[in-house]
Curated annotation (Swiss-Prot):
The lineage of its organism: Eukaryota, Metazoa, Chordata, Craniata, Vertebrata. Ca(2+) 3 binds at residues 260, 262, 264, 266, 271. This is Calcium-binding protein 4. One of its GO terms (molecular function) is transmembrane transporter binding. SMART domains: EFh. PROSITE patterns: EF_HAND_1, EF_HAND_2. Interacts with CACNA1F and CACNA1D (via IQ domain) in a calcium independent manner. Interacts (via N-terminus) with UNC119. Residues 133-168, 187-204, 210-245, 247-279 form the EF-hand domain. Its main location: cytoplasm. Ca(2+) 1 binds at residues 146, 148, 150, 152, 157. Residues 55-65 have a biased composition (Polar residues).
Length: 279
């Protein structure tokens, strides 16, 4: 009766709810892992794996260091390029040699220089005498600016006269020439003094700057019979005077064969020009 009054006073007791023991209790109370425990641990392991698979794309964590990749791997483009360009340095190393070989004078050019070099130096070098055609050219230019026909031209006309001959003096060169003429020549020059001034400029021409006229003059020095071809006999005859020393038979034939491009045993004017213009 007292118990019923107590229940009525406090209300009916709620039905007891089944409670799950905590994981620690299950782990300590059972000697073996039950199915619920295994499922819970399995889900934790899967979570960890999913988190590790997300990597830096979902979090700001740094990517773990990786081992060295293969040279052809696409993940390392710089190494891929190096791997692809590996043989290129050897090829580029050969390029300068091929280029220098192309521009290096060959034996034919050396033979032509030995054969024609002394001749060109004697005819067109700095120590040579001016030829009749060059003197005529200087005379024509001088007379053009000798307007009063007294045999002199003034220093003011020297620059224009030099340009008529094909030279383009700088302002400093004109000042030096004008001062020299004014101080030592009374402000004007005659033809002989004009030749002394212009002669060195004409003598500075080299073999690769020669025109067709000069090349034909040089060719005629060797072509004694004027048949348009230089033979071994003509070379032997011209060698002492033009080359400064006689040449023996084997040396003459060897030089002629190196310069003879078409193999006919002689050197024509075209072969002569090609040998002198080759660098």
């Amino acid at each position: 009766m007292a118990e019923e009054q107590g229940r009525g006073r406090h209300g009916p007791d709620p039905a007891p709810r089944p409670q799950k023991p905590p994981v620690e209790v299950l782990a300590s109370s059972s000697g073996a892992e039950g199915p619920p425990l295994m499922r819970k641990r399995s889900s934790k392991r899967e979570k960890g794996l999913r988190g590790s698979r997300k990597g830096p794309s979902s979090s700001g964590e740094q990517t773990p260091m990786q081992g060295p990749e293969a040279p052809g791997s696409s993940k390392n483009p710089s190494r891929t390029r190096e791997g692809q360009e590996g043989p290129i340095p050897s090829a580029s190393g050969l390029a300068p040699r091929r280029q220098s070989h192309r521009h290096r004078p060959g034996p034919q050019h050396d033979a032509a220089q030995r054969m024609y070099g002394p001749l060109l130096n004697r005819i067109f070098g700095k120590d040579r005498e001016l030829g009749p055609e060059e003197l005529d050219e200087l005379q024509a230019a001088f007379e053009e600016f000798d307007t009063d026909h007294d045999g002199y031209i003034g220093y003011r006309d020297l620059g224009e006269c030099m340009r008529t001959l094909g030279y383009m003096p700088t302002e400093m060169e004109l000042i030096e020439v004008s001062q020299h003429v004014k101080m030592r020549m009374g402000g004007r020059v005659d033809f002989e003094e004009f030749v002394e001034m212009m002669g060195p400029k004409l003598r500075e021409e080299t073999a690769h700057m020669l025109g067709l006229r000069e090349l034909r003059i040089a060719f005629r020095e060797f072509d004694r019979d004027r048949d348009g071809r230089i033979t071994v006999a003509e070379l032997r005859e011209a060698a002492p005077a033009l080359l400064g020393e006689p040449l023996v038979g084997p040396e003459l034939e060897e030089m002629l064969q190196e310069v003879d491009l078409n193999g006919d045993g002689t050197v024509d004017f075209n072969e002569f020009v090609m040998m002198l213009s080759r660098h």
